[in-house]
Amino acid sequence: MLNRRAFTFASIGLAATASLRTTGARANEETMATTTTKSPFEITKTPEEWRKTLTPEQFYVLREHGTERAGTSPLDKTYAAGTYDCAGCELPLFSSETKFNSGTGWPSFYQPLDNAVANTVDKSLFMTRTEVHCRRCGGHLGHVFEDGPPPTGLRYCMNGVALKFIPKAAS
């Protein structure tokens, strides 16, 4: 049977969890509003316009800051020569020369192409991470971590559904 002390602690824990959850959701909504309205990005579209050009999975990741399930993208195991472009606006983002197998189940790179991506602070999921987005359309790509290989020590952990692989033309 639940005594008064246990009930009090359970109530406090529930209230604290709800408070943190709504704070994170509010921060995420503000970030989403920045990428879909009053946008500093070269390419801006309404959510309806994005839905017409993206698959539901691409819309979820690129426009709603979602994450695809690990191991579901064929791009995780793609190592052919070429570039990985933004699935939203086709801006070249990463070269296959910087791709490596991180063992995470997501395509990973140690360095983006020059002037391709931008970063913001992501405080969702009870932690602080560095979110990576396309600098041209603002599409959410993934996150960058400081546990990658030389020469940068960085791991750009990208959602494969947010990328489009363009094979290098045969010479």
Task: Outline where the language-model segments fall.
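Short, non-ligating residues that shape and space the ligands of small metal-coordination modules
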Residues: 95-96, 143-144, 166
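C-terminal segment of N-terminal export signals and the immediately downstream linker at the start
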Residues: 22-58, 69
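Cys/His-coordinated zinc-binding microdomains
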Residues: 90, 138, 158-161
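Residues immediately within or flanking Cys/His clusters that coordinate Zn2+
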Residues: 83, 131, 154
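N-terminal secretory signal peptides and thylakoid transit peptides that target proteins
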Residues: 1-15
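Short cysteine-rich clusters marking metal-coordination/redox-active sites
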Residues: 86, 134-137
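Mid-length scaffold segments of soluble, non-membrane domains
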Residues: 79-108
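N-terminal post-signal-peptidase region of extra-cytosolic proteins
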Residues: 62-79
